[in-house]
Swiss-Prot record:
Similarity comment: Belongs to the bacterial ribosomal protein bL33 family.
Organism annotation: Hamiltonella defensa subsp. Acyrthosiphon pisum (strain 5AT)
GN (gene name): rpmG
Keywords: Ribonucleoprotein, Ribosomal protein
SUPFAM superfamilies per the UniProt record, alphabetical: Zn-binding ribosomal proteins (SSF57829)
Organism classification: Bacteria, Pseudomonadati, Pseudomonadota, Gammaproteobacteria, Enterobacterales
Protein name as catalogued: Large ribosomal subunit protein bL33
GO annotation terms (biological process): translation
Cross-referenced InterPro entries: Ribosomal_bL33, Ribosomal_bL33_CS, Ribosomal_bL33_sf, Ribosomal_zn-bd
GO cellular component terms, A-Z: cytosolic large ribosomal subunit
GO MF terms, alphabetically ordered: structural constituent of ribosome
Length: 55
């Protein structure tokens, strides 16, 4: 069975609320850490979400 190229990651809110999104990324093409501006429902604002590993 072939090893998956995509890696599951967690996007953690920089607002410190503990809210996160899960997604996947291609390990070969995306070598840098991902950063997105997404909606945080806890603070009701768009904040920066940074990549973290799923434990």
């Amino acid at each position: 069975m072939a090893k998956s190229v995509r890696e599951k990651i967690k996007l953690v809110s920089s607002a410190g609320t503990g809210h996160f999104y899960t997604t996947s990324k291609n390990k070969r093409t995306q070598t840098t850490k991902l950063e997105f501006k997404k909606y945080d429902p806890v603070v009701r604002q768009h904040v920066i979400y940074k990549e973290a590993k799923i434990k």
